[in-house]
């Protein structure tokens, strides 16, 4: 397949992308066992040595210091070269949802204590905000952080936490002022070994099976004052900042997976013959391929536009939201089309049905697509308003 994979990248970024693709193909093959915990740790350490777990972290802390565009290119290459999108998702969630808040809001002491090992792959981070009663309504958390001498005591539960079964540190959002709204949340760095912190059994998910996910419980879990990330009451702004990274750079991994499946689908319809000729020559098939390519390219343009705004400091809420919507919806539809064009082979164990299963959660995590549309509508001045009082 011959269409541009460079997106205007400079030579250094193209070389980095190609290196990541080669590494992923050579070292990150899971032999089909995407849910093997021991193999997950092996591959994580290899990814750390390659610099993938700290791409956007400054060099002084062991990272590569990449900007958002180069980081997105790296994640796209990882998604393209690694058949396990769940593993790529775990790397991206570690980096953009948990490590970047430490980079942007941590004290010098916190950065020095955590970032080197998080970059090298020796340690893994997880971001814990979602709760059974607080999904899209993320500001109304029931996990409480009660102030005590020299620290806080955390009580509550989190669910659907990516990397929870393997995490060494959790970036936890908790309510310090339940009535404070946007300013009522505080972010904490909580070590996995902290007394009172327990992790539930890993979920058995329909997709992203290579990404370990579980509940996390805090039972009167004491954390010292030095565990507060940023200022008390700044948790919502920290979360919002991390979501700009996640909705942009994390979703680049899906671009790589889409391209990989799109290429193999084109090869399939060229080779598969029915009625005496390749099925790619049938208009119904060729038009579907063109639609797949158009969705992929459109989503890619939106994502890299959002990445460039992150790099130059002009990012708002709209760009990452549109990128997240476009990529996730394109991935689901591309997966459906790839399955359909393979016929019976599409519902067997293979990369087409794997992409479809891995893409379904993408419309939900990082803020559901419906919530993203609300955010964009509000930015356009179309938010919900109270009805005018009747006279």
UniProtKB/Swiss-Prot annotation:
Enzyme class: oxidoreductase
Enzyme Commission number(s) from the entry: 1.3.8.14
Reactions listed under catalytic activity: L-prolyl-[peptidyl-carrier protein] + 2 oxidized [electron-transfer flavoprotein] + H(+) = (1H-pyrrole-2-carbonyl)-[peptidyl-carrier protein] + 2 reduced [electron-transfer flavoprotein]
GO function terms (MF aspect): acyl-CoA dehydrogenase activity; flavin adenine dinucleotide binding
UniProt: FAD binding residues: 272, 283
Disulfide bond positions: none
InterPro entries: Acyl-CoA_Oxase/DH_mid-dom, Acyl-CoA_Oxase/DH_mid-dom_sf, AcylCo_DH-like_C, AcylCo_DH/oxidase_C, AcylCoA_DH/ox_N, AcylCoA_DH/ox_N_sf, AcylCoA_DH/oxidase_NM_dom_sf, ProlPCPDhRedW
Active site: 246
Gene3D superfamilies: Acyl-CoA dehydrogenase/oxidase, N-terminal domain (1.10.540.10), Butyryl-CoA Dehydrogenase, subunit A, domain 2 (2.40.110.10), Butyryl-CoA Dehydrogenase, subunit A, domain 3 (1.20.140.10)
UniProt cross-references to SUPFAM superfamilies, sorted A to Z: Acyl-CoA dehydrogenase C-terminal domain-like (SSF47203), Acyl-CoA dehydrogenase NM domain-like (SSF56645)
GO cellular component, one term: cytoplasm
Function description: Involved in the biosynthesis of undecylprodigiosin. Catalyzes the desaturation of the L-prolyl-[prolyl-carrier protein] to yield 1H-pyrrole-2-carbonyl-[prolyl-carrier protein].
Protein family: Belongs to the acyl-CoA dehydrogenase family.
PANTHER family for this protein: ACYL-COA DEHYDROGENASE (PTHR43884), ISOVALERYL-COA DEHYDROGENASE, MITOCHONDRIAL-RELATED (PTHR43884:SF12)
Protein name (record): L-prolyl-[peptidyl-carrier protein] dehydrogenase
Source organism (scientific name): Streptomyces coelicolor (strain ATCC BAA-471 / A3(2) / M145)
